[in-house]
């Protein structure tokens, strides 16, 4: 099948086939101010730059300072003095999960509105972008930041939406709401009557009450422009590029201007840094990679100790992404940063214990590494369930799972040395 690298070129090709972009142009990308969304956009920025376009990408200073992304070939528009939205979101989501509290999904809307408000009211940022004389904008398609479409509207420049959101309301997709699993549930495509009611309500609610945007956003932030309700402006996007596909996800209807491009951020592994390479090469019995994402590095002590107890007892090595010290550095490598895709590409990687973010999920699929899913919040439960349905993972609740159960689950999904793949390990569909 077509490779994920070709999928990435398809994204670029699709964007550039717009009537507005034929030759080398000036493109501005504006992702959600979180590591995973910014990382995804950098892959597209690199591909655009390699095609001869001039590319700029907005990034808050707290991400710029971490220097964890490859920003060669394009220019960063640094957003200074912005709150750390990564911390704000984790306080309302991950911390509530670990405290057994109900998830506060409106924290996304509040953070997104504040982020958009700061950008859209900032004259310096607008003038900086205006000076670039951009020909095209690529905006994050999450509902929380869709008001950013006001910037290209003020400049009279076309725009596209790119990201993980399959939003039937703003993308104008005709559906039977009860039949499509909503991304904020853990439902699959085989639903009970109650689950269908929940799907119906969740799909219908944003079309009635959208708490993530201001309907009068155009008059608020661009009073000099002809008034448009924000949902009408959003619908003017030239194209919607949605990071999902029918290999991993359930069948979904689309419109002609909605393209499903799942897995575009994946690709072959790069050479590992020395400390990781030596550890992986020596692990002939295999390695389990454990991570809860770039946003969850400080786990509760009880969870951390549970994981360390399991990793210590496993008959093979492990790499644990967290702000902790390893009790046995020969067997457990701990780090606050890991080259995730490159580790998953290593032949000694056996199992991936993951929170089920979109990037990691597609990387695991690309490298055919089975997953023990530990979802924490938002769409991660949906992601975990669709992997389970595809026979490519098993889900555990990291809050309640016992040490023995977690160990047994990891060992169950680990291939033996005698075979290159376990019976459960999925073939590499995405290549």
Regions found by a protein language model. Give the residues of each.
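Nucleotide-sugar-dependent glycosyltransferase catalytic domains
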Residues: 33, 43-330, 337, 403, ...
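Cleavable N-terminal signal peptides of Sec/SRP-targeted secreted and luminal proteins
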Residues: 3-21, 387
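Short alpha-helix at the nucleotide-sugar/activated-sugar donor binding site of glycosyltransferases
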Residues: 153, 364-365, 388
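A donor-sugar binding/catalytic signature common to diverse glycosyltransferases
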Residues: 137-139, 336-384
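Conserved donor-nucleotide binding/catalytic region of nucleotide-linked donor-dependent transferases
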Residues: 389-394, 399, 411-428
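Short N-terminal binding/cap micro-motifs at the start of the first secondary-structure element
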Residues: 36-39
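Nucleotide-activated donor-dependent transferases that construct or modify glycoconjugates
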Residues: 18-34
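Residues that mark the start of a beta-strand
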Residues: 25-27, 287, 370
């Amino acid at each position: 099948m077509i490779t994920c690298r070709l999928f990435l070129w398809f994204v670029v090709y699709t964007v550039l086939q717009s009537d507005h972009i034929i030759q080398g142009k000036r493109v501005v990308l504006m992702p959600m101010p979180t590591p995973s969304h910014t990382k995804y956009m950098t892959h597209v920025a690199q591909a655009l730059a390699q095609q001869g376009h001039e590319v700029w990408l907005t990034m808050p200073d707290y991400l710029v300072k971490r220097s964890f992304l490859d920003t060669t070939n394009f220019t960063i528009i640094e957003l200074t003095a912005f709150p750390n939205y990564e911390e704000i979101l984790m306080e309302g989501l991950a911390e509530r999960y670990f405290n057994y509290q109900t998830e506060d999904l409106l924290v996304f809307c509040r953070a997104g509105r504040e982020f958009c408000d700061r950008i859209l009211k900032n004259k310096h940022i607008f003038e900086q972008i205006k000076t670039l004389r951009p020909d095209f904008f690529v905006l994050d398609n999450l509902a929380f930041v869709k008001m950013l479409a006001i910037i290209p509207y003020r400049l009279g420049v076309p725009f596209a939406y790119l990201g993980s959101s399959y939003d039937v309301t703003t993308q104008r997709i005709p559906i039977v709401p009860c039949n499509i699993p909503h991304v904020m549930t853990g439902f699959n495509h085989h639903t009970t009557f109650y689950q269908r009611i929940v799907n119906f309500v969740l799909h219908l609610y944003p079309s009635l009450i959208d708490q993530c945007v201001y309907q009068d956003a155009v008059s608020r932030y661009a009073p000099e422009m002809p008034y448009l309700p924000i949902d009408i402006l959003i619908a003017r996007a030239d194209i919607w590029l949605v990071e999902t596909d029918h290999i991993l996800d359930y069948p979904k209807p689309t419109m002609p201007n909605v393209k499903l491009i799942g897995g575009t951020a994946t690709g072959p592994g790069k050479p590992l840094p020395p400390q990781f390479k030596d550890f992986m090469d020596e692990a002939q019995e295999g390695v389990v990679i454990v991570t809860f994402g770039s946003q969850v590095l400080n786990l509760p002590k009880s969870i951390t100790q549970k994981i360390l107890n399991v990793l210590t007892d496993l008959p093979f090595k492990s790499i644990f992404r967290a702000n902790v010290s390893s009790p046995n550095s020969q067997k457990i490598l701990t780090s606050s940063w890991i080259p995730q895709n490159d580790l998953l590409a290593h032949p000694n990687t056996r199992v991936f214990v993951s929170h089920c973010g979109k990037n990691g999920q597609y990387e695991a699929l690309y490298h055919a590494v089975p997953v023990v899913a530990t979802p924490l919040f938002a769409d991660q439960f949906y992601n975990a369930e669709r992997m389970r349905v595809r026979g490519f993972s098993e889900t555990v609740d990291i809050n309640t799972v016992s040490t023995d159960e977690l160990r047994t689950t990891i060992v169950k999904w680990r291939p033996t040395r005698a075979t290159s793949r376990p019976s459960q390990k999925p073939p590499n569909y995405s290549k």
